[in-house]
Regions:
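ABC ATP-binding cassette signature C-motif
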Residues: 2-262
Length: 262
């Protein structure tokens, strides 16, 4: 990656719905993301976290302003849905369809079968149709297909959804040594604090704010119901902070984790 990875320049996005009417998700937001940045994204319900990831990958265009990609960017986006998988394919066919061999973050060359085994797909599972896999297994396969493509920027939208305890540990360990740029949306506090270096919040008023105090600052902001984060492009007040869903609470308990409803 060069010095320029992802840049938002005066980006504005407005959405409308019958329930909430017209709302501005982003109001002239300017933000630069560099090589090796590891960012956790949190925010109020409906603030636009998924929309922001879609702006980054180009599937959503801003109403005004510009989203710029670095010249050497290879971006992969893990969405909350698993409908990008072909249910008629077998597990091995699905991975080979991306690439037969790949290079790991450690520099070691690995085959599709090697990685599948590392992700818990062995024996009969290799020839199992995707449509016959559990939701957690499909999520695991979706992650593996992204990593096989050797991206240097990862966008992860609720990556811990449906993952079993072993896959959670494997994903955390992999991302710990992954050298690229990482942007994660998650309600799993442990996961964010393990794999991300900084936290940014979508405040629900069209602004994106850096939280130097991390998730603890967000929790304090939620308790006080008054603005406290540092300014990015523009930071205003917000009257209601999201109450995140628990998500995989049993798994957190199994690992003696501190999963908070923040």
């Amino acid at each position: 990656l060069g010095k320029d990875v992802l840049d938002l320049n005066e980006v504005t996005v407005t959405v409308s719905s019958d329930e909430l009417g017209e709302r501005t998700l982003f109001d002239k937001v300017t933000w630069s993301i560099g090589p090796g940045d590891r960012i956790g994204l949190i925010g109020v319900n409906g603030a636009g976290k998924t929309t922001l990831l879609n702006l980054f990958d180009g599937s959503r265009k801003p109403d005004s302003g510009r989203v710029k990609h670095g010249k050497t960017l290879r971006l992969a986006h893990l969405r909350q849905e698993v409908d990008d998988l072909d249910s008629a394919m077998t597990v091995l066919e699905s991975v080979n369809d991306v690439k037969a061999r790949t290079k790991l973050a450690t520099g070691r060359d690995a085959s599709a079968t090697d990685l599948l085994e590392g992700f818990g797909f062995t024996g009969q599972k290799l020839v199992t149709r995707i449509g016959d896999l559990s939701g957690g297994e499909q999520r695991r396969l979706q992650l593996l297909r992204l990593l096989m493509d050797e991206p240097n920027v990862l966008l992860l939208d609720e990556p811990t959804n449906d993952l079993d305890i072993d896959t959670l540990r494997l994903l955390e360990d992999y991302l710990d040594s992954w050298p690229g740029t990482l942007i994660v949306v998650s309600h799993d506090r442990w996961f964010l604090e393990r794999v991300c270096d900084v936290v940014w919040a979508l405040m629900g008023d069209g602004t994106v704010a850096f939280l130097p105090g991390g998730i603890s600052q967000y929790l304090e902001h939620r308790r006080n119901r008054k603005p406290s984060p540092s300014k990015s492009s523009r930071v205003g007040s917000t009257s209601q902070v999201a109450e995140p869903k628990m998500g995989a609470a049993e798994l957190r308990q199994a690992r003696s984790r501190n999963h908070l409803s923040w």
